[in-house]
Amino acid sequence: MPIAIMLDTKGPEYRIKTFENGKIELKDGDTFTLTTDDIVGNQKRVSVNYENLIKDLKVGDRVLVANGIIILQVRELKGNDAICDVIAGGTLSDRKSMNFPNKVMKHAYLSKQDKDDLLFGIKNEVDYVAASFVSTKQDVADLRSFLDENGGEDIEIIAKIENRSGVDHVEEICEIANGIMIARGDLGVEIPGVEVPAIQKYLINKCRMLGTRVITATEMLESMIHNPRPTRAELSDVANAVYDGSSAIMLSGESAAGKYPVEAVKNMAETAEYTEKQINYGKRFANAEFQTKSIVDAISHATCAMAIDVDAKCIVVSSLTGRTVRMVSRFRCPVDIIGMTTSEKAWRKLNLSWGVKPVLCEEYNSMEVMFYNAMNEAKSVMKLK
């Protein structure tokens, strides 16, 4: 089984700086100031790492600090200071994150840290870049240009949707991104939590219509960071992401820092496999509406329909880059797809495409050899006679 490597960028990150004693206590109704002046924080004010903060804010804006635990509302903008009312208080410690609901901050999308990380990824031949906090199509375009200019033309971009702007612009983002990730953790800070399930379903459905790969991620088996077994609610969450039509589902803290990483992967895989068997993909295919825009789309759709009509055991697709395989995969045909390619990089990346069994094969110099190899691979992979 090929394994692709994804590099996760830091993305635009807004944080407060440090306090004299490491932390303070804020109470509802307090006045607290965010400043671009370089100071050591105290009970009344703290520095931020974003120099254009005052230009981007306006009176009445809300600032969510420490993953939304603390809520500030801008009362006055004065010089380098944003003077705020504390709407929801709590303990505030060094270097906590800031979020700005329903705002697009005017910043360069790629920081120096991001560029250094991307150059590392290019040097080490990663397959995907997960682009954090994508707000608009231009963010993806800036990343694509940087990759192309530095030898990363083959690296594909997965745009992480983590704010309202990303949701609102998802269709144009999908025009140039190679897929999206629904990063529900930060999305649930930027957007009221009650909206996240509906937004998840909207984004997955939109991607299915557009033929774009979509990963559902974050807090899927969160309790398994500390516990050997998931809750029933978490298993239902995993299953619902599969029912909705996710191309892939993803663990984060559970496998990166949890006590039971193997058990978490096993529980997620077993739940996904069982759920897949309960879905009537033939019925979904017959009732689905797709945005077919090209001859390749039309041929791919017809291939799936024909495979269903003749009760084919599998569909074999040969492709150098993997693009044609992905075009067939987008229709979620209830027939296994064998994706043959001579490119090791394409072979690894095809593992993210729904319903595809990637096969790395030798180069061929004629159609006859290609068909012969395809038949042999189909028999081997599908255990056909």
Language model: regions and residue ranges:
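Non-catalytic helical/linker scaffolds that mediate oligomerization, partner binding
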Residues: 1-385
